[in-house]
Amino acid sequence: MSRVYDRLESATLLLARAGGIKDRLNGAWRQCLASIEPEDVPRELRLQFLELSQTMQRERPLRGEDAVRATIRKMSNEEAECQSAMIVRMFCRMTRQQELELALPMPASAAVVQLFAAEG
């Protein structure tokens, strides 16, 4: 899961850079997200990731381009912004999930075991 988190973070940072939204989306997808396998994505984000993946490859390419290039070429700037926002929201959701997991208190039985281990 940390690999997916790292990739989403990198994609978000790419999207935050200067430049045209379509160029930034292209870079974020190709450099960070295209190689992620859907089964590696946490279950609560998998459907959203699959939708993004399908959206990014929906257009038929012209000679000399691939489906991603064709799709981004045909996107409006507003649609590219929407897909970019989806990437940022997935990163934020994964960040919140990790924070919740870190904030969970240790079970009382685990604390007792640790105390006994420290005494003995």
Annotate the PLM regions.
Residues 1-31, 87-88:
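Short terminal alpha-helical segments
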Residues 69-120:
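Amphipathic alpha-helical binding modules
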Residues 19-66:
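Amphipathic alpha-helical interaction modules
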Residues 16-19, 23, 37-42, 91-106:
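Long, hydrophobic, amphipathic alpha-helical segments used as structural scaffolds
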Residues 9, 15-16, 46, 63, ...:
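Compositionally biased amphipathic helical and low-complexity segments enriched in hydrophobic
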Residues 7-13, 17, 37-44, 71-82:
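Non-transmembrane, amphipathic alpha-helical segments
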